[in-house]
Each structure stands twice: as C-alpha cells, then as structure tokens.
Amino acid sequence: MPDHAHSAIARRLKRANGHLETIVEMIEHGRPCAQIAQQLQAVESAIESAKKALIHDHLSHSLERSFKLSGAKGQAALRDFRAIAKYL
C-alpha cells in the first residue's frame, strides 16, 4: 500500500492524464496551436512536479533511515539536505 505522499503523486498524475486526454481531443478538433501548446505546458509542469515530489520523498525516506543511525550529527545533515534539496 503506497504511503500518503505516493497517493498524492498518483492523484496528481491521474489529473495530468485526464488533462492530456483533453489535449488529444483539442488536437483532433483542430483547436489553435497556441491553446494546445499552453495546455501541454501545464501537463508537462504537472508531470515534472510529480517527478520531483517522488524523488524528494524517496531521498528523504532513504536518508532518514540512514541518518537515524548517526545520531544528532546525522539528523543535522538530513536537515541540511532537505533545505538544499528543495532547489533541485
């Protein structure tokens, strides 16, 4: 069973998938390219956001398990990592 973060990521990707299906319909109905490109950008951003969330969650959990063994120094390193990782 996926954890809360993975459930949220799955929901985000399902929304992006639905949005992508709508874009296919836009193309099939001859909608203007500028509108299609705008919608594609939105889907691309949603997928990129989901990817980042998944990677951050995985790294955070993996490092948390590793650093728990390192005591206070490890916890400080984990906090530093989390602070900088948001800029990835």
Task: Locate predicted features.
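Solvent-exposed interaction patches of small proteins and small membrane subunits
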Residues: 1-88
